[in-house]
Swiss-Prot record:
The keyword Ribonucleoprotein applies. One of its GO terms (cellular component) is ribonucleoprotein complex. Belongs to the universal ribosomal protein uL4 family. One of the primary rRNA binding proteins, this protein initially binds near the 5'-end of the 23S rRNA. It is important during the early stages of 50S assembly. It makes multiple contacts with different domains of the 23S rRNA in the assembled 50S subunit and ribosome. Forms part of the polypeptide exit tunnel. Residues 63-94 are annotated as: Disordered. GO terms for biological process: translation. This is Large ribosomal subunit protein uL4. NCBIfam families: rplD_bact. Gene3D superfamilies: 3.40.1370.10. Residues 64-77 have a biased composition (Basic residues). Part of the 50S ribosomal subunit. Disulfide bonds: none annotated.
Length: 206
C-alpha cells in the first residue's frame, strides 16, 4: 500500500510503502472492542465506596424487644432497610483492571491502523518540527492539511516546539510512538503519522 508523504505546509514530499500486514488487514470490531474495554478498565479509578452495616456509626443494640409489640422483628438500626443504615451489597474500592493477552493487544493495534487506512484517514508527514513554538502557525498548518480532529504520532522523541505549539489546540492529541494506542486512534477522526513513526511501527511488528 503506497501513501503520499506531505510536509507540514501541505507540499508533496514523496511516497511511503505501508506494510499490508499492519495497515492492510480487514478490521475486526470484536478485537477493537476488547482492547478498548481493556484500556478503559485500566483507567477507571475504582474508588467508589458505600458503607455496609458493619461500618455505620450507630449503636448495634436491638431496637426493641422481640415479642409483644406487634411490630416487625428487627435487630440493629444499622440494617439497610432503615434511613441512615448500611448499604446492602454496595460498591467497594477495587481495581477494574483485567488481563488481555499481548498478542490480542498487538493485533488490536494493527486492526485500528488498518481501520484508519481503509477509511483513508491516515496522513503521513515527513517530519513534525517547528522553528518556533507558535500555536497560531501550527493551527494554520493543520488547516492547510484539513485537520480539525486528529491524533498526531511522532517519533521516539517529539520536537519540543511542536509539542508546545500543539498543547492548546482542541481535538488534537500529540503522542510519541511509544504512546500509540487503540483507544486514542479510534477516538480521533484522522491519524497523522510522521515518517519516523511509520518506520518505528514497521520495525515493531517485523
Amino acid at each position: 500500500m503506497d501513501l503520499k508523504i506531505t510536509t507540514l505546509g501541505g507540499k508533496d514530499a514523496g511516497k511511503v510503502k505501508l506494510s499490508e500486514e499492519i495497515f492492510g488487514l480487514d478490521p475486526r470490531e470484536d478485537i477493537l472492542q476488547r482492547v478498548v474495554r481493556w484500556q478503559l478498565a485500566k483507567k477507571q479509578q475504582g474508588t467508589h465506596k458505600a458503607k455496609g452495616r458493619a461500618e455505620i456509626a450507630r449503636t448495634g443494640a436491638k431496637m426493641y424487644k422481640q415479642k409483644g409489640t406487634g411490630r416487625a422483628r428487627h435487630h440493629s438500626a444499622r440494617a439497610p432497610q432503615f434511613r441512615g443504615g448500611g448499604k446492602a451489597h454496595g460498591p467497594v474500592v477495587r481495581s477494574h483492571e483485567h488481563d488481555l493477552p499481548k498478542n490480542v493487544r498487538a493485533l488490536g493495534l494493527k486492526h485500528a491502523l488498518s481501520a484508519k487506512a481503509k477509511s483513508a484517514s491516515i496522513i503521513v508527514i515527513d517530519e513534525l518540527k517547528l522553528t518556533e513554538a507558535k500555536t497560531k502557525a501550527l493551527i494554520a498548518n493543520f488547516a492547510t492539511l484539513g485537520l480539525s480532529n486528529a491524533l498526531v504520532i511522532g517519533g521516539a522523541e517529539l520536537d519540543k516546539n511542536f509539542k508546545l505549539a500543539a498543547t492548546n489546540i482542541p481535538n488534537i492529541d500529540v503522542l510519541p510512538i511509544q504512546g500509540i494506542n487503540v483507544y486514542d486512534i479510534l477516538r480521533r477522526g484522522t491519524l497523522v503519522l510522521s515518517k519516523a513513526a511509520v518506520e518505528a511501527l514497521e520495525e515493531r511488528f517485523k
